[in-house]
Amino acid sequence: MEETLNQEKMVEEIAKRIREILEILGENPDREGLRETPLRVARALLEMTSGLRTPQPQIKTFNLSEDGISEVEDQIILVKNIGFSSLCEHHLLPIIGKVHVAYIVGQERKVAGFSKIIRIVNYYASRPQIQERLVQQIADAIMNSDIHPKGVMVIGDALHMCAYVRGVKDREASLLSVATRGLFKNNVSLRNYVFRLLETSKKTSLL
């Protein structure tokens, strides 16, 4: 109950300031089209920054050796095309793109729940961010998780609205950022293998 009250108070306080910003810009926040805008913006901002106020999701693990699956150690698992949106911390404008996560199964032969990787991406995206930090945080979270992988590689590819709608107004440029941990760190062949997997999957995808 207290958390709900705090949330409502935050919405109220943010909405007040959005209303003030509209007035400073020369708008009338009482006109029909803008009457509910401060509340809508407040709720949207709270949703897009929810990672600041919630604990990191736990990564559920599955031990494949217990399921009779042999030769799983050293297998590369790739979760690709994880759509995400975040807020550029410099302009508070959207970053929209995809993240690909690869990891090498460790000696304990544990793998991560599919949806849990997606939740980790969304968790670190739900805050003011820069893409370079985002991929690092995702990589660290998975590398330090209970699956104990031998290596992690995270690739982010996104459009940044701060360059799309203002400044240079470039509609085509995207930012590619890569974070590596463990065996991926110093092994170019492993990194290239992941890039080849992504390229091959584009040509053979059923979706």
From Swiss-Prot:
Gene Ontology MF: a single term: zinc ion binding
TM helices/strands, residue ranges: none
Amino acids binding Zn(2+): 88, 91, 162
Database matches in InterPro entries: GTP-CH-I_C/QueF, GTP-CH-I_N, GTP_CycHdrlase_I, GTP_CycHdrlase_I_CS, GTP_CycHdrlase_I_dom
Catalytic activity of the protein: GTP + H2O = 7,8-dihydroneopterin 3'-triphosphate + formate + H(+)
GO cellular component: cytoplasm
Top-level enzyme category: hydrolase
Keywords: GTP-binding, Hydrolase, Metal-binding, Nucleotide-binding, One-carbon metabolism, Zinc
UniProt key word Hydrolase: yes
Any GO BP annotation: tetrahydrobiopterin biosynthetic process
EC numbers: 3.5.4.16
Functional pathway: Cofactor biosynthesis; 7,8-dihydroneopterin triphosphate biosynthesis; 7,8-dihydroneopterin triphosphate from GTP: step 1/1
Subunit structure: Toroid-shaped homodecamer, composed of two pentamers of five dimers.
NCBIfam families reported for this sequence: PRK09347.1-2 (NF006825), PRK09347.1-3 (NF006826)
Record-stated family: Belongs to the GTP cyclohydrolase I family.
Protein name: GTP cyclohydrolase 1
Organism field: Sulfurisphaera tokodaii (strain DSM 16993 / JCM 10545 / NBRC 100140 / 7) (Sulfolobus tokodaii)
